Each structure stands twice: as C-alpha cells, then as structure tokens.
A protein has these predicted regions:
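Generic recognition of cysteine residues
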Residues: 6, 20-23
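PEST-like low-complexity, intrinsically disordered acidic/proline/serine-rich tracts
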Residues: 22-253
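Hydrophobic h-region of N-terminal signal peptides that target proteins for export
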Residues: 12-21
Length: 253
C-alpha cells in the first residue's frame, strides 16, 4: 500500500508541474526536447549475449540458479532474489520481460520520473545539470551509499535521443538469467521515439569488475499504452507458494 501511495504522490506532483507550464514564473520544458511522457508496454525482452566475464563475474554467474533462460531451474531450486520479493535492482528492472516491463515516463522541468508496474517502484533521472556522484560505497564519510536503482542523470542528444547514465547501483543480479552487476558498473540507456506510439530503448553496460569489455545488453521496442496495472510481489504469498506448491512438486517421488 505504501509503495502504491508513494507512486500516486509522485504522479500527482509531476502532473502539477506539467499542468502549470504556462503559469507565470514557472519554468517550462524546452520545446526542443522530445516528450517521452506516457505509459509504455514492453516486449518479451531478448537479452543480447554478454561480453566475456572476469573471473569474479563468471563465479557469480555460475553460482546463480535462475528461473528463466537456458540455465533455468524449478522455483524450489532457484536462488533468484525475486523469489523472496527482493527489489529487482538495476539494471534488471529495465531488462524485464512483458508484462513485468510495463513502465510510465513522466517528464518534468528537472527530471524524468520512471514508474515501473512491477512492485510499484520508481526512479529519478535528473536533467538539471548535476553530475553523477563519485566514490559511491567508498570508505569516506562523504561517500554516498549504494542504492537498489543507483544514481541517474540524463540529457538530450542533438538527434532527440534521451540518454541516461546510472552509477552506484547495488551489487545484484543484472538480469533474470543471473548475469552479475557490480557496484562499479555504469549503465547507459538511450530512449528514442520511433513514432508517436513506439519507443526504442537501447541499454549498454560498462562493468569492468564483472565483464572484460563494455557490451550491448538489450535493444527493446515499447508500444504506447493507457495505464499501468497493480503488480506487487507479496512476501507472504511467495512463501506460501514455495511451501505448498514449489517444494512439494520438486521433492523426490
């Protein structure tokens, strides 16, 4: 309920800003910027092959027991954090398959808000000219803490593409197949409107702790939708499913 109310509060504040663009003294969104606002329904994401992994990256990947992909295992045998309703983390949240990939973009004067249907979470991509934080998770008292969804800034390129960069995301599964993501990783997202109802998202990853070189993680096409649905992971229900269905089904006969 709290996450749902928070999402409504964010939407309400963003709508207030957008609705008052003509008010005296209120800054307006530059007309040169492509307006990405709207609900976007994603595809059944196909992940691109990752770059060769480092020794540590390969060890983490080998230890992962995913629910999806060529190495998938039964739910009862999986160690995927989402079976416990943990947050998806980043960049996994932008690499989900449909219908989990549905999202809404709300464009304001100083940031782009990205609201996700699954688990009702949101992230802020700041466009006010700030820089990305340095030394996230470092030992200095001034070092910012890692976040599930990292720290993000964005800008518009000359060809109208919205480019977002993210650092400082917690070390989590990078996608549903168990590819690793390190704290020092850097993720670039490129959002391009192909037409009024079609949005392309290209995701590039540079994570030298886990991969030997940068690589293209995915290229997805979203279609415009009307509204998001409520899609929450409930820990008590997830545990009941494991205890009453998944584990008995996996037990030796």
């Amino acid at each position: 309920m709290r996450s749902y109310l928070c999402r409504l509060a964010v939407l309400a504040s963003a709508t207030a800003v957008l609705g008052c663009q003509g008010c005296s003294g209120t800054p307006t969104i530059s007309q040169s910027h492509t307006d990405l606002s709207g609900v976007w329904l994603g595809p059944a994401t196909t992940l691109e092959p990752s770059a060769p992994m480092t020794v540590r990256g390969q060890a983490l990947f080998d230890a992962a027991k995913p629910l999806y992909g060529p190495r998938s295992v039964p739910v009862a045998d999986s160690n995927d954090p989402v079976t416990r309703c943990d947050p998806q983390g980043f960049p996994r949240i932008i690499l989900l398959r449909a219908p989990l990939s549905a999202m809404e973009l709300v464009q304001t004067t100083d940031r782009v808000l990205q609201l996700f249907q699954y688990q009702g979470v949101y992230r802020e991509i700041w466009t006010d000219g700030r820089s990305l934080p340095a030394d996230v998770g470092g030992s200095s008292p001034q070092s910012p803490d890692p976040r599930w969804y990292g720290y993000s800034i964005g800008h518009w390129s000359n060809d109208g593409v919205f480019v977002a960069e993210t650092v400082g995301a917690m070390e989590t599964w990078g996608d549903e197949e168990g590819h690793p993501h390190g704290l020092g990783g850097r993720v670039e997202e490129r959002y391009r409107l192909l037409d009024h109802d079609t949005l392309e998202l290209v995701v590039n990853i540079d994570d030298p702790e886990m991969y030997q070189k940068p690589f293209l993680a995915s290229k997805q096409v979203f279609k415009r939708g009307k509204e998001l649905s409520e899609q929450l992971c409930v820990p008590s229900v997830a545990q009941q499913y494991l205890d009453l269905i998944a584990k008995p089904a996996a037990a030796p006969k």
